[in-house]
């Protein structure tokens, strides 16, 4: 049995302090410690066919070999006994002990093959990944800030507006420039005649179409003749409305013409005074002064009877306007506090 103990001692790998075993080796070591504790240093030489009992024998043999190293070296034995003991020890070795030794050797070789280059390479890869992650986060934060940032206002309203050049090019392209479509040109709304504002303030616009006033006057005479001849009341009312509208148009056109004449004369007079050196700055008419001069010109163009009728109409118009603006009161001597008559009298205007 001394040879078997010696073989087990040589096959068994002595664990190092910094060696890391696998789970299987750890479980084997735990079972070995438990068996040593139960045996309390006793030596068992029984043989079993099961793997669990073989593991127990191996642990017992290991402990026995460690305890009797000095005894084996001191006792001389014969060659015949050595051969028998060697065969017996080979038969006593279990598969669990062999697997345990193989696992410990594999772990040791794997640890030896591990070089610092792998550690440096893995650390370099980790650093690169960390930097890429940080750069990606910074880019996302910058994009979010740029979206939330408000548009910068211009330094002044006359400064050019800033527009982004990152715009998608449209797929629609104009290969050949087509000639513009012909448009109808109405001289009544032409800028050369009506002025750039389009409100008929051009000085030559009225002169170019002065003949239209003659047409309107002739149309007005025709409508009056039709109203005089017709006997249908509905048709007569309709013609009367048309005549009234045309008269209003002619009257407004004449008033505009008078205003333009008054303005032209005033400007001409002011320019003459400035040219003579009597005035340094021109005087611009107020609207009230302009209307007053227009009325004077209007009444000056009328005859005596027509002027009297016009003045009478204007007097009645102004009187009715003033009467509407006057306050009202109830008739009766004893009125209520709110001004109402006790017997429901009519209201009258204050004189």
Curated annotation (Swiss-Prot):
Residues 146-157 have a biased composition (Basic residues). Its main location: nucleus. Residues 105-144, 296-311, 319-334 have a biased composition (Basic and acidic residues). Residues 1-205, 248-279, 296-351 are annotated as: Disordered. One of its GO terms (biological process) is maturation of SSU-rRNA from tricistronic rRNA transcript (SSU-rRNA, 5.8S rRNA, LSU-rRNA). Residues 22-39 have a biased composition (Low complexity). Residues 119-152, 216-276 form a coiled coil. Residues 48-63, 71-84 have a biased composition (Acidic residues). GO terms for cellular component: 90S preribosome; nucleolus. InterPro entries: RRP36. Associates with 90S and pre-40S pre-ribosomal particles. Component of the 90S pre-ribosome involved in the maturation of rRNAs. Required for early cleavages of the pre-RNAs in the 40S ribosomal subunit maturation pathway. Belongs to the RRP36 family. This is rRNA biogenesis protein rrp36. It comes from Penicillium rubens (strain ATCC 28089 / DSM 1075 / NRRL 1951 / Wisconsin 54-1255) (Penicillium chrysogenum). The gene is rrp36.
